[in-house]
A protein has these predicted regions:
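Acidic/histidine-rich catalytic cores and adjacent linkers
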Residues: 1-9, 15-18, 37-176
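Short alpha-helix plus adjacent loop in nuclease-associated cores
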Residues: 17-38
Length: 176
């Protein structure tokens, strides 16, 4: 990449960063409360944006968080980091103000007593420049990933067919 695009800056994909955050937080929740994995509605309530929850799920989540103060602390920390990571279209000056807050949150993750949160903190720290660039630049490779997914589905459906021209035609129809 550096050879062909010497001035290019790598920007982390917001979808993957948020997915990583959710994945490691859910691992920590399940480490604290192993019975949680059998309560699917509760897991969904902890994963879903609070603005998108029904009143019933919101109440269920709040009751659970009152019973589990450690999980509640991690959950509210995750929400704070999530809100910070979801910011878009920031100027360079605004980004400069947000960086210390981001680094402070990452440092507290690295000092966590839970291994999965430590790992998340180390990962975010290693990718800090790419993650911070998300606030300023919003272009990503989501379209390319979508096309690759469609192409894999076509291949799966057409397993055993040998006509490459037919495959190429299907890809052109579905991806244009």
């Amino acid at each position: 990449i550096r050879r062909y695009f010497p001035n290019a800056m790598i920007v982390a994909d917001r979808f993957h960063v948020i997915r990583l955050l959710n994945q490691f937080c859910l691992q920590t929740y399940q480490q604290i409360d192993p019975e949680m994995k059998y309560q699917r509605g509760l897991l969904a309530a902890l994963r879903t944006n609070p603005n998108n929850l029904t009143v019933k799920r919101l109440n269920r989540r709040e009751r659970y968080l009152q019973q589990q103060p450690v999980i509640a602390a991690i959950y509210y920390f995750k929400q704070r980091l999530h809100r910070l990571l979801m910011r878009k279209h920031r100027t360079a000056k605004q980004c400069t103000r947000l960086i210390p807050l981001f680094l402070k949150l990452v440092a507290s993750l690295k000092e966590s007593p839970f291994d999965s949160l430590k790992t998340l903190g180390k990962t975010l720290y290693q990718w800090r420049e790419e993650v911070v660039r998300m606030w300023r630049f919003t272009k990503n490779n989501g379209i390319t990933e979508g096309f690759h997914r469609k192409m894999k589905l076509i291949q799966r459906r057409a397993y055993g067919f040998r006509n490459f021209e037919n495959y190429r035609l299907r890809v052109k129809v579905l991806c244009s």
